[in-house]
Regions:
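Extreme N-terminal starter segment of soluble prokaryotic enzymes
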Residues: 1-5
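Residue-level signature of catalytic and energy-coupling elements of molecular machines
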Residues: 144, 178, 225
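ATP-dependent small-molecule kinase phosphotransfer cores
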Residues: 37-174
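Active-site catalytic pocket residues across diverse enzymes, especially alpha/beta-hydrolases
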Residues: 26, 30, 102
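A short, Lys/Arg-enriched amphipathic alpha-helix followed by its capping loop at the start of a domain
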Residues: 18-26
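Small-molecule kinase domains that catalyze NTP-dependent phosphoryl transfer to phosphate-bearing small molecules
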Residues: 6-13, 20, 32, 36-39, ...
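Hydrophobic anchor at the start of a short beta-strand
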Residues: 29, 85, 176, 195-198
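Short His-Asn-centered micro-motif
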Residues: 8, 90, 179-181
Length: 273
């Protein structure tokens, strides 16, 4: 049965970093990597083999973007990672709609905070049901927040949880990690599916949209980690201790016999020193 962990918290609370860490921990537990870590941005890095300029295989550490869904990465991940651990997001379907239907760029939907804060051609004054005072152009983040929450969730409150949990049920990874739990119905949906919700306390208070302020009102989370004054390493230690208490982590298979390592096709990029 799939174990589901959802991280709740405001933007920049460390939700994605926690998911990256657990990806590495799970991959090491299944002996799919020997070592892993996080870079300065909280992204997963794992040991791999790459060819040097002379064509010789050299062991190095490379970045593994666990959120990728492109064709080359999916071919590798479908057998090498996703059966054991997979990243999910309640906003995934929304982002697909914003790119495919509304014309936002992939960077605006999936990129950095700078990318998501780029202005779009959509205006507040054109938003259905909007009664605020803003009339100028919306950032990509604002557009996704409004369309995802004030339009789609207004029509069907569980639209994003239904889609995400259905995908998890169909794909059945050993561990499913959800990085963007923000609403009470999302907490309850994860728990009904047998999962657990970990709330992180760190985060910015500058965003007044309900998708951010609702985090303060969440009730019934399975655990809360006050990471406001913790380092990434200390936060990871808290997560390991917590999940071990649930019996949800640890080595699950015997280490296989040594063999020539395969490069993670399309999955790993060499980290520039």
């Amino acid at each position: 049965m799939t174990k589901i962990i959802a991280f709740a918290g405001k933007k920049q609370s460390g939700k994605n970093t926690c998911c990256s860490f657990l990806h590495g921990y799970q991959l090491r537990s299944y002996h799919l990597v020997e070592d892993f870590g996080l870079d300065e941005e909280g992204c997963l890095v794992v040991d791999t083999m790459m060819l040097d300029a002379s064509g010789q295989a050299q062991k190095t550490m490379g970045a593994l973007d666990v959120t990728r869904t492109d064709h080359d990465f999916s071919l590798w991940a479908a057998s090498n990672m996703w059966p054991f651990v997979k990243h999910y997001s309640f906003a995934s379907a929304l982002k697909e709609i914003c790119v495919g239907l509304f014309g936002l760029s992939k960077d605006q939907c999936y990129g950095s905070d700078i990318d998501k804060n780029q202005l779009t051609w959509f205006r507040w004054s054109d938003m259905p049901g909007y009664k605020g005072k803003k009339k100028d152009k919306m950032t990509a983040r604002e557009f996704m927040q409004y369309v995802g929450t004030d339009v789609f969730r207004y029509i069907h409150p569980s639209i994003w949880t239904d889609r995400t949990l259905s995908s998890i049920s169909n794909e059945s990874p050993a561990l499913a990690l959800i990085s963007d739990c923000r609403f009470q119905n999302e907490v309850e949906a994860v728990q009904r599916a047998g999962g657990k919700v970990i709330k992180l306390t760190r985060g910015l208070d500058s965003d007044g949209h309900s998708s951010e302020t609702s985090v303060d009102k969440l009730k019934g989370c399975d655990a809360t980690i006050d990471n406001s004054k913790l380092t990434i390493e200390e936060t990871n230690g808290e997560i390991v201790e917590l999940m071990n208490s649930w019996g949800w982590l640890g080595s699950v298979i015997e280490k296989p016999k040594e063999k020539d390592p395969d490069n993670l096709v399309g999955g790993i990029q060499k980290i520039k020193e």
